[in-house]
Design a protein with these regions (language model features):
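Terminal targeting signals and extreme-terminal segments of soluble enzymes
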Residues: 1-286
Length: 286
Protein backbone atom coordinates (compact mmCIF):
# COMPACT_ATOMS: atom_id res chain seq x y z
CA UNK A 1 0.00 0.00 0.00
CA UNK A 2 1.27 3.48 -0.85
CA UNK A 3 0.04 6.92 0.17
CA UNK A 4 -1.36 9.58 -2.16
CA UNK A 5 1.87 11.56 -1.91
CA UNK A 6 3.90 8.46 -2.73
CA UNK A 7 1.73 7.90 -5.81
CA UNK A 8 2.25 11.51 -6.89
CA UNK A 9 6.01 11.10 -6.36
CA UNK A 10 5.92 7.84 -8.36
CA UNK A 11 4.21 9.52 -11.31
CA UNK A 12 6.42 12.64 -11.17
CA UNK A 13 9.43 10.99 -12.79
CA UNK A 14 12.95 12.47 -12.89
CA UNK A 15 14.15 14.45 -15.88
CA UNK A 16 17.68 13.49 -16.96
CA UNK A 17 17.82 15.32 -20.29
CA UNK A 18 15.37 17.37 -22.35
CA UNK A 19 13.60 14.29 -23.72
CA UNK A 20 14.85 11.60 -21.31
CA UNK A 21 13.16 10.71 -18.00
CA UNK A 22 13.61 7.94 -15.43
CA UNK A 23 10.85 6.48 -13.27
CA UNK A 24 10.80 4.14 -10.28
CA UNK A 25 8.28 1.33 -9.83
CA UNK A 26 5.21 0.55 -7.76
CA UNK A 27 6.03 -2.74 -6.01
CA UNK A 28 3.25 -5.06 -7.09
CA UNK A 29 2.46 -8.36 -5.37
CA UNK A 30 3.02 -10.23 -8.65
CA UNK A 31 6.48 -8.83 -9.42
CA UNK A 32 5.67 -7.25 -12.80
CA UNK A 33 5.28 -3.53 -13.45
CA UNK A 34 1.64 -2.43 -13.22
CA UNK A 35 0.38 -1.13 -16.57
CA UNK A 36 -1.37 1.86 -15.04
CA UNK A 37 1.94 3.05 -13.62
CA UNK A 38 3.56 3.08 -17.07
CA UNK A 39 0.54 4.89 -18.52
CA UNK A 40 0.72 7.60 -15.86
CA UNK A 41 4.49 8.01 -16.01
CA UNK A 42 4.60 8.15 -19.80
CA UNK A 43 1.89 10.82 -19.79
CA UNK A 44 3.93 12.81 -17.25
CA UNK A 45 7.02 12.57 -19.48
CA UNK A 46 5.06 13.78 -22.52
CA UNK A 47 3.55 16.68 -20.55
CA UNK A 48 7.02 17.98 -19.64
CA UNK A 49 7.75 18.66 -23.32
CA UNK A 50 4.43 20.28 -24.26
CA UNK A 51 3.46 24.00 -24.19
CA UNK A 52 1.69 24.81 -20.91
CA UNK A 53 -1.57 25.89 -22.61
CA UNK A 54 -2.19 22.39 -24.05
CA UNK A 55 -4.05 19.62 -22.26
CA UNK A 56 -3.95 15.90 -23.09
CA UNK A 57 -7.11 14.72 -24.85
CA UNK A 58 -6.01 11.22 -25.88
CA UNK A 59 -3.30 8.62 -25.38
CA UNK A 60 -2.82 5.24 -27.07
CA UNK A 61 -0.30 2.76 -25.70
CA UNK A 62 1.00 -0.74 -26.44
CA UNK A 63 2.52 -2.98 -23.77
CA UNK A 64 5.38 -4.77 -25.52
CA UNK A 65 7.13 -6.66 -22.70
CA UNK A 66 6.32 -7.25 -19.06
CA UNK A 67 8.33 -4.87 -16.89
CA UNK A 68 10.47 -5.87 -13.89
CA UNK A 69 9.55 -3.93 -10.72
CA UNK A 70 13.19 -4.01 -9.57
CA UNK A 71 14.55 -2.13 -12.59
CA UNK A 72 13.97 1.64 -13.17
CA UNK A 73 12.24 2.61 -16.42
CA UNK A 74 13.76 5.00 -18.97
CA UNK A 75 11.25 7.12 -20.88
CA UNK A 76 12.27 8.76 -24.16
CA UNK A 77 10.01 11.38 -25.73
CA UNK A 78 9.86 12.23 -29.44
CA UNK A 79 8.43 15.67 -30.25
CA UNK A 80 6.46 14.59 -33.30
CA UNK A 81 4.65 17.86 -33.99
CA UNK A 82 3.69 21.22 -32.49
CA UNK A 83 0.82 22.74 -34.46
CA UNK A 84 -1.28 25.85 -33.88
CA UNK A 85 -3.89 23.91 -31.89
CA UNK A 86 -2.52 20.40 -31.34
CA UNK A 87 0.73 18.88 -30.10
CA UNK A 88 1.68 15.23 -30.70
CA UNK A 89 4.25 13.27 -28.70
CA UNK A 90 5.52 9.71 -28.79
CA UNK A 91 6.93 8.08 -25.65
CA UNK A 92 8.89 4.82 -25.56
CA UNK A 93 9.68 3.13 -22.23
CA UNK A 94 12.81 0.97 -21.86
CA UNK A 95 14.28 -1.39 -19.29
CA UNK A 96 17.91 -2.41 -19.78
CA UNK A 97 17.78 -1.18 -23.37
CA UNK A 98 14.66 -3.14 -24.34
CA UNK A 99 11.42 -1.37 -25.23
CA UNK A 100 8.60 -2.48 -22.91
CA UNK A 101 5.94 0.10 -23.88
CA UNK A 102 5.24 2.76 -26.47
CA UNK A 103 2.60 5.45 -26.54
CA UNK A 104 1.32 8.28 -28.70
CA UNK A 105 -0.40 11.20 -26.97
CA UNK A 106 -2.16 14.26 -28.34
CA UNK A 107 -2.60 17.62 -26.61
CA UNK A 108 -5.04 20.39 -27.50
CA UNK A 109 -5.61 24.03 -26.59
CA UNK A 110 -8.92 24.94 -24.93
CA UNK A 111 -11.57 25.63 -27.57
CA UNK A 112 -15.30 26.36 -27.62
CA UNK A 113 -17.46 23.91 -29.54
CA UNK A 114 -20.60 21.80 -29.61
CA UNK A 115 -21.34 19.57 -26.64
CA UNK A 116 -23.19 16.28 -26.12
CA UNK A 117 -22.66 12.98 -24.31
CA UNK A 118 -24.32 9.67 -23.49
CA UNK A 119 -26.31 9.41 -20.27
CA UNK A 120 -24.69 8.01 -17.15
CA UNK A 121 -26.08 4.58 -16.16
CA UNK A 122 -28.79 4.69 -13.50
CA UNK A 123 -27.06 2.87 -10.63
CA UNK A 124 -26.89 3.12 -6.85
CA UNK A 125 -24.86 6.04 -5.50
CA UNK A 126 -21.61 5.33 -3.62
CA UNK A 127 -23.04 6.29 -0.21
CA UNK A 128 -25.36 3.24 -0.47
CA UNK A 129 -22.62 0.73 -1.34
CA UNK A 130 -19.88 -1.24 0.39
CA UNK A 131 -16.27 -1.06 -0.72
CA UNK A 132 -14.83 -4.13 -2.40
CA UNK A 133 -12.67 -4.71 0.70
CA UNK A 134 -15.78 -4.73 2.89
CA UNK A 135 -17.33 -7.24 0.48
CA UNK A 136 -14.20 -9.39 0.68
CA UNK A 137 -14.11 -9.51 4.49
CA UNK A 138 -16.47 -12.51 4.44
CA UNK A 139 -13.55 -14.45 2.94
CA UNK A 140 -11.37 -13.94 6.02
CA UNK A 141 -12.90 -16.88 7.87
CA UNK A 142 -13.92 -18.94 4.85
CA UNK A 143 -10.64 -18.74 2.90
CA UNK A 144 -8.03 -16.67 4.81
CA UNK A 145 -5.20 -17.53 2.41
CA UNK A 146 -7.14 -16.22 -0.60
CA UNK A 147 -8.22 -13.15 1.39
CA UNK A 148 -4.61 -12.29 2.26
CA UNK A 149 -3.55 -12.80 -1.37
CA UNK A 150 -6.31 -10.47 -2.59
CA UNK A 151 -5.48 -7.79 -0.01
CA UNK A 152 -1.78 -7.96 -0.86
CA UNK A 153 -2.60 -7.22 -4.51
CA UNK A 154 -5.18 -4.50 -3.73
CA UNK A 155 -4.23 -0.86 -4.55
CA UNK A 156 -5.54 0.50 -1.26
CA UNK A 157 -4.67 4.06 -2.22
CA UNK A 158 -8.01 3.97 -4.09
CA UNK A 159 -11.48 3.20 -2.80
CA UNK A 160 -13.61 1.00 -5.04
CA UNK A 161 -17.35 0.55 -4.54
CA UNK A 162 -18.76 -2.01 -7.00
CA UNK A 163 -22.48 -1.65 -7.71
CA UNK A 164 -22.65 -5.47 -7.71
CA UNK A 165 -20.23 -7.98 -6.22
CA UNK A 166 -16.55 -7.21 -6.89
CA UNK A 167 -15.44 -9.05 -10.02
CA UNK A 168 -12.59 -10.89 -8.30
CA UNK A 169 -15.11 -12.31 -5.78
CA UNK A 170 -17.52 -13.64 -8.39
CA UNK A 171 -17.65 -17.40 -9.00
CA UNK A 172 -20.68 -17.59 -11.30
CA UNK A 173 -20.95 -16.60 -14.95
CA UNK A 174 -22.66 -13.30 -15.71
CA UNK A 175 -22.96 -10.69 -18.42
CA UNK A 176 -19.68 -8.87 -19.19
CA UNK A 177 -20.78 -5.63 -17.55
CA UNK A 178 -19.44 -3.82 -14.47
CA UNK A 179 -20.22 -0.54 -12.71
CA UNK A 180 -17.65 0.57 -10.16
CA UNK A 181 -17.41 3.83 -8.22
CA UNK A 182 -13.83 4.82 -7.40
CA UNK A 183 -11.75 7.70 -6.06
CA UNK A 184 -8.36 8.32 -4.54
CA UNK A 185 -8.72 8.14 -0.76
CA UNK A 186 -6.96 11.34 0.25
CA UNK A 187 -7.91 14.86 -0.75
CA UNK A 188 -5.29 16.20 -3.11
CA UNK A 189 -4.46 19.53 -4.72
CA UNK A 190 -3.35 18.94 -8.29
CA UNK A 191 -3.52 20.54 -11.73
CA UNK A 192 -5.40 18.82 -14.54
CA UNK A 193 -2.20 17.20 -15.86
CA UNK A 194 -1.59 15.34 -12.58
CA UNK A 195 -5.30 14.49 -12.27
CA UNK A 196 -5.08 12.88 -15.71
CA UNK A 197 -1.93 10.95 -14.78
CA UNK A 198 -3.64 9.51 -11.68
CA UNK A 199 -6.73 8.63 -13.73
CA UNK A 200 -4.51 6.86 -16.27
CA UNK A 201 -3.05 4.83 -13.39
CA UNK A 202 -6.50 3.93 -12.03
CA UNK A 203 -8.07 3.21 -15.43
CA UNK A 204 -6.08 -0.02 -15.77
CA UNK A 205 -8.04 -1.63 -12.92
CA UNK A 206 -11.10 -3.83 -13.65
CA UNK A 207 -11.09 -3.51 -17.45
CA UNK A 208 -9.62 -6.90 -18.28
CA UNK A 209 -11.40 -8.63 -15.38
CA UNK A 210 -14.75 -7.57 -16.86
CA UNK A 211 -13.96 -9.77 -19.86
CA UNK A 212 -13.78 -12.78 -17.50
CA UNK A 213 -17.35 -12.42 -16.20
CA UNK A 214 -19.04 -14.81 -18.69
CA UNK A 215 -16.38 -17.43 -17.85
CA UNK A 216 -15.98 -17.24 -14.05
CA UNK A 217 -17.15 -20.80 -13.32
CA UNK A 218 -14.53 -22.19 -15.70
CA UNK A 219 -11.57 -20.01 -14.73
CA UNK A 220 -12.06 -19.08 -11.07
CA UNK A 221 -10.07 -22.11 -9.87
CA UNK A 222 -7.74 -22.20 -12.87
CA UNK A 223 -4.27 -20.75 -13.05
CA UNK A 224 -4.58 -17.82 -15.44
CA UNK A 225 -2.08 -15.36 -16.88
CA UNK A 226 -3.47 -11.86 -17.40
CA UNK A 227 -1.65 -9.00 -19.12
CA UNK A 228 -2.69 -5.73 -20.73
CA UNK A 229 -1.79 -5.66 -24.42
CA UNK A 230 -2.88 -2.14 -25.30
CA UNK A 231 -4.74 0.73 -23.66
CA UNK A 232 -6.37 3.87 -25.04
CA UNK A 233 -7.73 6.74 -22.98
CA UNK A 234 -9.64 9.85 -24.10
CA UNK A 235 -10.10 12.80 -21.73
CA UNK A 236 -13.35 14.62 -22.49
CA UNK A 237 -13.85 17.02 -19.58
CA UNK A 238 -12.14 18.19 -16.39
CA UNK A 239 -12.67 16.21 -13.19
CA UNK A 240 -11.46 15.69 -9.62
CA UNK A 241 -9.84 12.33 -8.92
CA UNK A 242 -10.62 12.64 -5.18
CA UNK A 243 -14.38 12.83 -5.92
CA UNK A 244 -16.37 9.69 -6.67
CA UNK A 245 -16.23 8.65 -10.35
CA UNK A 246 -18.30 5.90 -11.97
CA UNK A 247 -16.47 3.42 -14.21
CA UNK A 248 -19.06 1.79 -16.52
CA UNK A 249 -17.34 -1.14 -18.25
CA UNK A 250 -18.44 -3.67 -20.84
CA UNK A 251 -16.61 -6.39 -22.74
CA UNK A 252 -18.06 -6.86 -26.25
CA UNK A 253 -15.73 -9.73 -27.17
CA UNK A 254 -13.27 -12.36 -25.99
CA UNK A 255 -11.52 -14.71 -28.42
CA UNK A 256 -8.15 -16.29 -29.18
CA UNK A 257 -7.06 -15.85 -25.51
CA UNK A 258 -7.71 -12.10 -25.70
CA UNK A 259 -10.43 -10.08 -24.02
CA UNK A 260 -11.58 -6.67 -25.25
CA UNK A 261 -13.19 -4.15 -22.89
CA UNK A 262 -14.31 -0.55 -23.07
CA UNK A 263 -15.30 1.86 -20.34
CA UNK A 264 -16.96 5.24 -19.84
CA UNK A 265 -16.13 7.32 -16.76
CA UNK A 266 -18.59 9.79 -15.22
CA UNK A 267 -18.56 12.12 -12.23
CA UNK A 268 -21.39 12.09 -9.68
CA UNK A 269 -23.27 14.81 -11.55
CA UNK A 270 -23.41 12.59 -14.64
CA UNK A 271 -20.73 14.44 -16.61
CA UNK A 272 -18.80 12.08 -18.89
CA UNK A 273 -15.15 12.76 -18.23
CA UNK A 274 -13.28 9.99 -20.06
CA UNK A 275 -13.50 6.92 -22.30
CA UNK A 276 -11.21 3.88 -22.16
CA UNK A 277 -10.56 0.80 -24.29
CA UNK A 278 -8.24 -2.11 -23.67
CA UNK A 279 -7.39 -5.53 -25.05
CA UNK A 280 -5.70 -7.99 -22.73
CA UNK A 281 -4.30 -11.49 -22.67
CA UNK A 282 -6.36 -14.13 -20.80
CA UNK A 283 -4.22 -17.26 -21.03
CA UNK A 284 -4.56 -20.49 -19.08
CA UNK A 285 -1.34 -21.94 -17.71
CA UNK A 286 -0.72 -25.30 -19.37
Amino acid sequence: MISSQELIDLLTIDRKEKYHFVGQNYKTAWGRVFGGQVLGQSLHAAYQTVPSNRIAHSMHGYFILGGDVNIPIDYHVDDIRDGRSFTTRRVVAFQEGKAIFNMAASFHIKEEGENHQIQMPNVLTPDLLLTDIQQAEALQKKDPIRFQRLMKAHPQIFEFKPVNKAIYLQTRNSLPLAHIWFRIKDKITADIALQQQILAFASDYSLLLTATLPHRQKIVDSKMYYASLDHALWFHRDFKIDDWLLYAIESPSASNARGFSKGSIFDQKGKMIASVTQEGLMRKFK
